From Swiss-Prot:
Pathway note: Nucleotide-sugar biosynthesis; ADP-L-glycero-beta-D-manno-heptose biosynthesis; ADP-L-glycero-beta-D-manno-heptose from D-glycero-beta-D-manno-heptose 7-phosphate: step 4/4; Bacterial outer membrane biogenesis; LPS core biosynthesis
Protein name: ADP-L-glycero-D-manno-heptose-6-epimerase
Annotated residues for binding of NADP(+): 10-11, 31-32, 38, 53, 75-79, 92, 143, 169, 177
GO MF annotations in UniProt: ADP-glyceromanno-heptose 6-epimerase activity; NADP binding
Organism the protein comes from: Pasteurella multocida (strain Pm70)
Amino acid sequence: MIIVTGGAGFIGSNIVKALNELGRTDILVVDNLKDGTKFANLVDLDIADYCDKEDFIASIIAGDDLGDIEVIFHEGACSATTEWDGKYIMHNNYEYSKELLHYCLDREIPFFYASSAATYGDKTEFREEREFEAPLNVYGYSKFLFDQYVRAILPEANSPVCGFRYFNVYGPRENHKGAMASVAFHLNNQILKGEKPKLFAGSEHFRRDFVYVGDVAAVNIWCWQNNISGIYNLGTGNAESFLEVAKAVVKFHGKTEADIEIIPFPEHLKSRYQEYTQANLDKLRATGYDKPFKTVAQGVAEYMAWLNRK
C-alpha cells in the first residue's frame, strides 16, 4: 500500500494521478475534507481507501499496524503563507510531520515530504544550506524547522527520507486553494468572468521559479523509485516574470499583452513579498534526475487547456 497525505489537495492529488499512471491504485489518501470541494480532485482517480488526517495521526501515534506500507508521500499541511496562528501551524506542519517521520523510520518505510522555498525568505540565492535559510513567516519557519530536524536524523536513517522544497507550483487540481491558488488560475478566472486580467504594477520585474505540478509529481515518483534521501529544491532552475505567466494565459484566450490591466501593488504585501526565486538544482541533478522541466509558456498552455476543457 502507498499512503499519500494531503492526497485530496493540490500536489497530493497529482501524485495520486502519477501513481495511477504507473498502474498503482492500492493508495490510502489521508486528508481533511472539511473543505468538501476538494473531493473533486479525487473523482477521476482510483484509490483503495480514505482516512481523515486526525484519525490517521491518532493511529500513527498509537503505533497501530496499518498493514504493508511501501512508501508515504507526506503532502498534507497548512500551506497558507498568510496564516499567522503559530500554534496551529507548528502543530499541523511540524509536530504532525515528526510523528509520521518516526513511524516510518521505526519501520523502514520510505518517507517523502513537502518542504518549501519559503524556507529561504527573501534571500537571493536558493541553495539547500543553512546560510541561505531565513523564513519570513511562520509557515516557512515550520518547514525550515522540520528540514533541520530531518538533517539531524538523516545520518542514522536506514530508509529513504527525502524533502522537496517546492517553488511556485501551478497546474491542475488547485481550484480549492482560493487566494493561495496560482496567478495563472486567477487570471484565467478573471477572463472567464469577462473582466480584464489584472497584474500588479512592476510584475515584469517580479520573477519566480514557476514549476508545473506534473513535473513536481514526476520528481517525487522518480526519487522514490531510486531510493533518494536528502533535502532538494524542486523548481525549474529558471526564474520567469509574472508578466510571462499573464502573457501565456491571454495568448490561450486569443488576447494580447495590451488586454492586461495593471493595478497598484498592495502596501500590506510589500514587506512580506518574495520578489525573486530561482531554485538551484545542482543537488537534485546530482542524484541523476535529468528530465527537463516545462517552461512557463509550455506549462501554462497545458494548464489552460485543462482548466478550460469542455
